[in-house]
Amino acid sequence: MDIKIPYTPRKHQAFLHNQISKNRWSVLVCHRRFGKTVCMINHLIRSALLSKQKNPRFAYISPTFKQSKSIAWDYMKQFTAKIPYTKFNETELRVDLPNGARITLLGSENSDGLRGIYLDGCVIDEYANVHSKLFPEIIRPALSLSLIHI
């Protein structure tokens, strides 16, 4: 199935997409109007669609669930809306893609509530505002079995 996502990265965003794909872990420090959220939402979508894993799981995590909804949910729906057989779960802020991939938007306000999840890829937005244990104690173990670069 040929899928066209309605997103054209700017020059520096295209560079980042390329570099992120070459590394296991990436940290981006970009100016306020760089387009980080749109860039990373589209990176998650592409990674989920191209994943060779069976039913891959991806997450976008911001400091709070409310922030994920207000900042990223509309973008997620906008950029996946034209993908045939895509399903949206408004309550859980989840997109189920036709290849079995799932992208969920999460909040880190109860980081212990994220323990035990499995992830193939993840984006943490506003990293300075999440609990310091989120990545080393919760997200890194969730990604430990995955070799996907995101």
Predicted region positions:
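Phosphate/NTP-binding elements of NTP-utilizing enzymes
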Residues: 1-148
